[in-house]
Regions:
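Short, well-ordered loop/turn sites that connect or cap secondary structure elements
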Residues: 35-36
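Contiguous surface segments at macromolecular interaction interfaces
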Residues: 1-5, 10, 24-30, 70-134
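A generic "cationic amphipathic patch" detector
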Residues: 19, 51-54, 76, 99
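Short, polar loop/linker segments at the starts of domains and inter-domain junctions
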Residues: 15-24
Length: 134
């Protein structure tokens, strides 16, 4: 089992939670293919909207990958992003970036946020998960 962070606006994360899916890196297939059934994904949201909105700077969702299927979904005539099915946990408390900064591995992960999708340790994932589920 592996643990991942996806970066997306809170609005987009909430659409995924409601629909039971994840998308990362503007719908690219390759990052999704690295995840396997049973892996966990934490979503970090810098803002409420994709190109605008208020600062969020928090982990806003956590879920487990359902199967090994990566599929395309037609959102618009010229936009068919790739998705994975996810069972999201009912995580009542978004985890602010300040809590993530308390973890010793945060410095190395902070630099990777700009990539939109990256692997993290079980320990870091648990640090965030415990806060979200408290």
């Amino acid at each position: 089992m592996r643990y991942w962070v996806g970066v997306a606006s809170r609005d987009h994360v909430l659409l995924g939670v409601a629909g039971g899916f994840c998308q990362v890196c503007h719908g690219k297939q390759a990052p999704l293919a690295r995840m396997k059934q049973g892996d966990w994904i934490l979503y970090y949201s810098p803002k409420t909207g994709m190109n605008s909105g208020e600062k969020v700077q928090a982990f806003t969702a956590v879920g487990q990958i359902v199967d090994d299927r990566v599929y395309q979904f037609r959102m618009a005539e010229n936009f068919e992003p790739f998705r994975r099915d996810v069972v999201f946990q009912d995580a009542p408390h978004p985890c602010p970036i300040e809590v993530a900064r308390e973890h010793p591995e945060w410095r190395s992960y902070a630099k990777q946020l700009r990539y939109g999708h990256f692997e993290v340790s079980h320990d870091f994932s648990e640090h965030i998960y415990r806060y979200m589920m408290r």
